A protein has these predicted regions:
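Non-catalytic interaction-recognition regions
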Residues: 1, 6-405
Length: 405
């Protein structure tokens, strides 16, 4: 993992600017409002049709490079098209206890940052960064125009393949419902309280830290647990799992072009299109197998028993069970489609479909009420397929499955 620092752009700027000038991709304006500026002429270009004043200033008349100009240099480096590399050193990660570490928060990948000189650099890090097969910039949709400029600049600099490998993962903004904003301590006007959602704004001083959001979610999850199980001792690890699941599903269930108005109560609901609903389904499947084993009955199928399910008579595999199999069978296709379109919401919708299949299976095909061993085995197999599918999809979404809800 690499921190983006000024050093990267400082070293890359002269080379990228020379490439753009040599290719005729930027011109020095001598008159008009952009006199003295280096400008990328975009008027009439296909991606910018219909735009007024589409031309983009890359370097101002006082020699200052604009953000977009820096992003062009950074993009060319990420694509490996600058023909240079930098010196790197491990960057300290400071844990919540204030102790400096050289391990990332996930306990695996070291963090690196660039250096201006070789002294103290890690030679093994050279060549590890930049030159990606694809470069995916995760930036909100309001930056679509600058990102189009960056892509066009890469193309005009003489790297059409690099432009094709440049992807803007655009997403709409994340806002808060008025009730959630006030819950987090944001002071709202009467006008703001009447809105569908409240935008975060640095200019207005409206902002929420991610840590505060998660902390409040954990508190609300504990309240949910105590409401459902009065007298229960609060289980922090379970509340954290529910809170993280609620947040991740809520943030990914919408398509990228939809504004997300985050609401605590809706996110933590145990019914509907929510993380707790999916976690509950996963926990219940595990509970069913555990109860079967407690009764001395077969639980999870082993490989040999699972292989024998396909040989069962069709009478034991009715339409209800086949519907479950078909739903779960679309998992790989859904993964591929989500990766191809960068639409994570497809995974959430699939997980919800599997969750609905579980609830249908639970109510219409109870294992203990099966007529015989063959029918019971078919129902166990369908339930096991649901359990593994939920585990796979929730795992990709980063949604933890607690031991109990």
């Amino acid at each position: 993992r690499l921190f983006r620092v000024t050093g990267v752009q400082t070293c890359a700027l002269p080379i990228s600017f020379d490439l753009l000038k040599a290719a005729g991709a930027t011109q020095l304006e001598t008159e008009g409002k952009n006199a003295g500026c280096w400008v990328m002429k975009l008027e009439g270009a296909k991606e910018f049709e219909g735009m007024e004043d589409a031309d983009k200033v890359l370097v101002r008349s006082n020699g200052t490079v604009t953000y977009t100009g820096k992003d062009v240099a950074y993009q060319l480096w990420k694509l490996g098209d600058l023909g240079i590399d930098f010196e790197y050193e491990k960057a300290p990660y400071v844990n919540p206890f204030g102790e400096a570490e050289f391990i990332a928060s996930d306990g695996t990948s070291p963090l690196y940052r660039t250096r201006h000189d070789a002294e103290g650099a890690d030679p093994s890090a050279r060549g590890r960064f930049g030159g990606g097969d694809s470069v995916i910039n995760v930036i909100d949709v309001r930056q679509s125009y600058p990102q189009k400029v960056v892509k066009e600049a890469v193309r005009r600099a003489g790297f059409p393949e690099g432009a094709d490998r440049s992807v803007h993962f655009a997403y709409e903004m994340v806002a808060l419902t008025p009730a959630s904003a006030e819950l987090l301590g944001v002071t709202l006007s009467d006008e703001d309280r009447g809105r569908a959602y409240v935008e975060m704004s640095g200019r207005k001083g409206l902002g929420v830290k991610a840590d505060d959001l998660v902390e409040r979610l954990v508190e609300k999850a504990i309240e949910q647990i105590l409401d459902r199980q009065p007298g229960e001792r609060p289980d922090l690890s379970r509340a954290e799992a529910i809170a993280i699941g609620a947040l991740r599903v809520y943030m990914t269930r919408y398509s990228r072009n939809k504004v997300i108005a985050f609401d605590f109560d809706e996110a933590l609901a145990f019914e509907g299109d929510t993380g707790p609903y999916l976690q509950y389904a996963a926990v219940r499947t595990a509970n069913i197998f555990r109860k079967l084993e407690e009764k001395g009955l077969p639980g999870l199928l082993d490989a040999e028993e699972a292989a024998s399910v396909g040989a069962l008579d069709a009478a034991h595999l009715d339409d209800g069970l086949w519907d479950v199999v078909r739903t779960c069978g679309r998992t790989q296709e859904t993964f591929e489609k989500a990766a191809e379109t960068f639409e994570v919401s497809l995974l959430v919708r699939h997980a919800l479909a599997v969750g609905a299949a579980f609830h249908h299976l639970y109510h219409t095909h109870p294992i203990l009420q099966a007529e015989n061993d063959e029918s019971r085995r078919a129902r166990r197999a369908a339930l096991q397929l649901v359990a593994r599918t939920l585990e796979d999809v929730l795992g990709v979404l980063g949604v933890p499955i607690p031991e109990r809800m």
